[in-house]
Amino acid sequence: MSFLHVDHVTHTYFSIKEKTTAVRDIHFDAEKGDFISFLGPSGCGKTTLLSIIAGLIEPSEGRVLIEGREPNQKEHNIGYMLQQDYLFPWKSIEENVLLGLKIADTLTEESKAAALGLLPEFGLIDVEKKYPKELSGGMRQRAALARTLAPNPSLLLLDEPFSALDFQTKLSLENLVFRTLKEYQKTAVLVTHDIGEAIAMSDTIFLFSNQPGTIHQIFTIPKELAAMLPFDARQEPSFQTLFQTIWKELNSLEKQQRNH
């Protein structure tokens, strides 16, 4: 059985005046350690699907299974990393990083040492007693990654985590996240609008069409490209070829959206 099984998921939002189907008949599998990306026009249901996988929304139809069971935060310890770091400004970096362990009631001397040990791995030296406002945007996002990984999640969900950063910081964090997830054998799902980011970080890209969101096309990243650090992958001719292919498909979908 696959690690992540999305079984013909459809989700519809209802209001007093209308109903809107955000995603329709989404079906795919991902194995442990896979990195997959959702790419597509704005409003195609990528974040809705991510929320369904996280167990935050129950789908109107279909189901999601993680290791054969429906998503459950206590059982699966799902990690979420968002566009903003959402560090609590009144808490120190140490307190922020340990927050998930405290909430899950799994904070021990051993788990504390392991969590705080992530900080120097991520280039954050002597920051434990500092507060978020004392760190740069890139440093805060690194601290947020440490907080996300501290409870040892089985699945990591990334909702445009680099989009608010400058390009140099973004490239650096892409490498860091990629290397960390490979080292710890984490399964990850990335939502992004950035074609290059999706190619550089993923094993598989799901390109979504809009209204309602459906899987328009699936791109499997060549193994030699998927094994490279994102920065190195961006230099490869095969990266540019795949970028152009996906860009044309995405551009066609966006034109269709504008014409409706």
UniProtKB/Swiss-Prot annotation:
Q: In its UniProt entry, what is this protein called?
A: Uncharacterized ABC transporter ATP-binding protein YtlC
Q: What class of enzyme is it?
A: translocase
- Which key words tag this protein in UniProt? ATP-binding, Nucleotide-binding, Translocase, Transport
Instruction: Name the family.
Output: Belongs to the ABC transporter superfamily.
Span of domain ABC transporter: 4-231
- Coiled coil residues, start to end: none
Q: Does the keyword ATP-binding apply?
A: yes
Q: Which residues does the annotation say bind ATP? A: G40, P41, S42, G43, C44, G45, K46, T47
State the Gene3D superfamilies in the record: P-loop containing nucleotide triphosphate hydrolases
> To which species is this protein native?
Bacillus subtilis (strain 168)
Citing just one GO molecular function, the answer is:
ATP hydrolysis activity
Enzyme Commission designation: 7.-.-.-
Q: Does the keyword Nucleotide-binding apply?
A: yes
**One Pfam family of this protein, by short name?**
ABC_tran
* Record PROSITE patterns: ABC_TRANSPORTER_1, ABC_TRANSPORTER_2
Q: Which InterPro entries match?
A: AAA+_ATPase, ABC_transporter-like_ATP-bd, ABC_transporter-like_CS, ABC_transporter_ATP-bind, P-loop_NTPase
